[in-house]
C-alpha cells in the first residue's frame, strides 16, 4: 500500500533526485517521477477495487 498522497509523492521524487546536477532538466525529471508514481498508485487502486488478490502482472 503505497502512499499515494501527492505531497508524499512530491517529496519522495525530490529526495530521489536531490543530487541531480542538470539545472534545467531536474524539474522535468521530478515531474516525470511524480507522474509515473501517481499512475502506479491509480493502477493499484483500480486493481484492488476490482477485487484482484494477485500482486503484480501475471
Curated annotation (Swiss-Prot):
Keywords: Disulfide bond, Glycoprotein, Pheromone, Secreted. SUPFAM superfamilies: Mollusk pheromone. Produced by the albumen gland of the egg cordons. It is found in: Secreted. The keyword Disulfide bond applies. Disulfide bonds join 4-41, 13-33, 20-26. InterPro entries: Attractin, Attractin_sf. Glycans are attached at residue 8. GO terms for cellular component: extracellular region. The keyword Transferase does not apply. GO terms for molecular function: mating pheromone activity. It holds the Pfam family Attractin. GO terms for biological process: sexual reproduction. Water-borne pheromone that attract the marine mollusk Aplysia into breeding aggregations and coordinate male and female reproductive behavior within the aggregation. This is Attractin. The lineage of its organism: Eukaryota, Metazoa, Spiralia, Lophotrochozoa, Mollusca. The gene is ATT.
Amino acid at each position: 500500500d503505497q502512499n499515494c498522497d501527492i505531497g508524499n509523492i512530491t517529496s519522495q521524487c525530490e529526495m530521489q533526485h536531490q543530487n541531480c546536477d542538470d539545472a534545467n532538466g531536474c524539474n522535468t525529471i521530478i515531474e516525470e517521477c511524480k507522474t509515473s508514481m501517481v499512475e502506479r498508485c491509480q493502477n493499484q487502486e483500480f486493481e484492488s477495487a476490482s477485487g484482484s488478490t494477485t500482486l503484480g502482472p501475471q
